[in-house]
């Protein structure tokens, strides 16, 4: 295992392990998320989309300020032998929301704060959609690492 230091090695710095290979690359904020993606690719024989989903689930657990199930996000995906695809995981307006409802309440635009500007979180559903379209493993396999970290620490 190699060591990856944040600054020059002076024997007092903390380190996180770095993993390297010849058939792919994984980069996440947390080494636990990276290791999850690595394991999904190498032990579980998943594809890059499976690995990304597993890493996102772990990242939401260990770094909820960076990625959360109640949030949003956009993914640019590149399936093999296909053009890139954008998967929009931004929040959705509630079904019954429309501008007329705002106008009748005296608003001329969507407010910056409060329940009227809140959207339905779509991060989690975008992970599922990515797996439906491009994944090869079942959700139980992909989520087992996040479950283990949540249960065992």
Spans of model-derived segments:
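Noncatalytic scaffold domains of N-terminal-nucleophile
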Residues: 2-43, 48-153
